[in-house]
């Protein structure tokens, strides 16, 4: 049997993934910061999922963006349904820690969200983000429309040029469409840094400006 450490740098194969459960984890459906629902139909609003390391700090980055209606943290991109935090940390689910961002396209452009995403972490680090090591910390953009997907790819290429000029390696961000199922994380993790203002935040960018979303 493989140890947990074996899954820090590679995704589990189908037979290695934990089975998970049919029932979703309990969720208090109110955003602690803005009072909006975390789960719903969100008619007339757009959605995207971002993975950029530990989701505690990542979520705060996006709930502070004007035009974002709500945010929630969860697990996405893997195989285990309704995984728990401890299961995700084992590396045996294949999920990355993700932030669901629900936004009003009339108030904030997708390009602006992409700029926040790229500048808030180092997308060249593969299966880690800073001191946080494991497949659950990989960089990811999970798109809900073809237009989002095309924009995400174009933004990656534009930002790669800036990173290369500054001495960074290749972007390893996983960009997918359609977006995989987003499994909401436990209540304790929702808006974590609003509940614990001095809590851990390992998020750190490269300092390289992303040349998109400036005039959007």
Swiss-Prot record:
Gene Ontology annotations for the cellular component aspect, listed alphabetically: cytoplasm
A Gene Ontology biological process term: cellular response to oxidative stress
GO molecular function, one term: peptide-methionine (S)-S-oxide reductase activity
Keyword Oxidoreductase attributed: yes
Keyword flag Oxidoreductase: yes
Gene3D superfamilies: Peptide methionine sulphoxide reductase MsrA
Keywords (A to Z) from UniProt: Oxidoreductase
SUPFAM superfamilies per record: Peptide methionine sulfoxide reductase (SSF55068)
Catalyzed chemical reaction(s): L-methionyl-[protein] + [thioredoxin]-disulfide + H2O = L-methionyl-(S)-S-oxide-[protein] + [thioredoxin]-dithiol; [thioredoxin]-disulfide + L-methionine + H2O = L-methionine (S)-S-oxide + [thioredoxin]-dithiol
Active site: 54
Family assignment from sequence similarity: Belongs to the MsrA Met sulfoxide reductase family.
Function: Has an important function as a repair enzyme for proteins that have been inactivated by oxidation. Catalyzes the reversible oxidation-reduction of methionine sulfoxide in proteins to methionine.
Protein name: Peptide methionine sulfoxide reductase MsrA
Natural source organism: Xanthomonas campestris pv. phaseoli
Lineage: Bacteria, Pseudomonadati, Pseudomonadota, Gammaproteobacteria, Lysobacterales
